[in-house]
């Protein structure tokens, strides 16, 4: 039965609802099921949610970057009467028609090429933030434990620490360095919407708004966007993680999260028992679309690469870059991950190797 909550009357009540959404989602997921939520649009369009969204956006210097309508947060919302602002956003939810996205190009760190960034209109940004506030706790409770990009209380340092732990504890030194070709530009809208529904977003009005957001075209380029999530939208990182969670779930169920007949309290006990099976070891660490899979032999690494390529094509309509997806023995060569170079070198440890990061 779908869960439904009253709309929040204060920002304190909104935080309580966020906690309740997370807790219920987590409990159902950990019990082996998936949650179901309806009535989410009422929470998203509540006055307290709109206030919170505006506070979140105005603290970002990007709030003064105009979209195609040339409007900014300070001039067109913060200086307007409060009842007008709330009514305008609630009207946007009721009759949602996103404006086209203004595209700008920014430099990629350490590279000569530029990255496209989509700038939604300020009203659409507020709507997106209202939606993110409500959707994030539901989805966060179900995401893979070792994806670290664009998530609360997580960062690249934690991803690197996880790699260190895997190397130290398992001795899985063969690495598949994953690179998905134009990942964010090729996200399939239909698969994404189905995944959101699968993860508990049963309010079809919310799904229709997300679908409209995804299809908002880019000014001077196209009227309708048929695939991808616009980089620059406030909800885009969350939606990208929802999509890539399909891959996370598939990889982790092959080894790390594969259910065993007996439930082991300690991960090490589970690891020892799995080593006695014919399963192929595979430890995934992901940060946005950058990821590695650690395994124990070259043959297993090549097996992971081939099976992952097939899975991405068949289930997600994505493609591994054959040139950039590498197989590396990190006892002999550095891997590049999240701007760092990582290698195992001879040293005093139980396995005879210690990590070195540059």
List PLM regions with ranges.
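Conserved polymerase palm-domain catalytic core
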Residues: 85, 100, 104, 145-146, ...
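Duplex nucleic acid-engaging cores and interfaces of nucleic-acid transaction enzymes
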Residues: 2, 13, 117-132, 142-143, ...
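Non-catalytic, polymerase-adjacent accessory regions of viral genome-replication enzymes
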Residues: 1-83
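Amphipathic alpha-helical blocks
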Residues: 77-98
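Residues immediately flanking
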Residues: 68, 133, 178-180, 297, ...
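Short hydrophobic/aromatic beta-strand micro-patches
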Residues: 76, 120, 294-296
């Amino acid at each position: 039965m779908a869960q439904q909550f009253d709309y929040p009357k204060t920002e304190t009540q909104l935080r309580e609802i966020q906690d309740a959404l997370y807790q219920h989602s987590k409990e159902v997921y950990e019990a082996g099921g998936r949650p179901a939520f309806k009535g989410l649009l009422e929470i998203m369009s509540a006055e307290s949610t709109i206030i919170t969204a505006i506070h979140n956006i105005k603290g970002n210097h990007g709030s003064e970057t105009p979209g195609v309508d040339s409007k900014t947060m300070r001039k067109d919302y913060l200086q307007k009467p409060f009842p007008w602002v709330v009514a305008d956003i609630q009207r946007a939810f009721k009759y949602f028609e996103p404006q086209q996205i203004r595209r700008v190009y920014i430099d990629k760190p350490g590279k000569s090429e530029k990255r496209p960034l989509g700038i939604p209109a300020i009203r659409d940004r507020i709507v997106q933030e209202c939606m993110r506030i409500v959707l994030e706790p539901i989805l966060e409770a179900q995401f893979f434990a070792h994806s670290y990009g664009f998530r609360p209380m997580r960062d690249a340092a934690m991803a690197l620490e996880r790699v260190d732990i895997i190397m130290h504890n398992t001795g899985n030194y063969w690495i598949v360095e994953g690179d998905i070709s134009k990942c964010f530009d090729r996200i399939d809208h239909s698969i994404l919407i189905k995944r959101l529904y699968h993860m508990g977003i049963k309010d079809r009005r919310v799904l229709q708004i997300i679908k409209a957001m995804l299809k908002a075209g880019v000014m001077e380029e196209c009227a309708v966007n048929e695939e991808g999530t616009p980089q620059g939208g406030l909800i885009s990182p969350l939606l990208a993680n929802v999509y890539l969670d399909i891959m996370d779930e598939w990889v982790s169920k092959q080894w790390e999260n594969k259910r065993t007949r007996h439930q082991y309290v300690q991960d090490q006990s589970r690891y020892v028992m799995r080593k006695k099976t014919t399963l192929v070891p595979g430890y995934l660490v992901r940060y946005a679309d950058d990821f590695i899979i650690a395994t124990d032999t070259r043959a297993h690494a090549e097996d992971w690469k081939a099976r992952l390529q097939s899975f991405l094509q068949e289930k997600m309509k994505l493609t591994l870059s054959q040139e950039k997806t590498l197989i590396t023995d990190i006892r002999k060569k550095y891997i590049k991950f999240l701007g760092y170079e990582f290698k195992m070198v001879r040293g005093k440890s139980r396995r005879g190797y210690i990590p070195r990061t540059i």
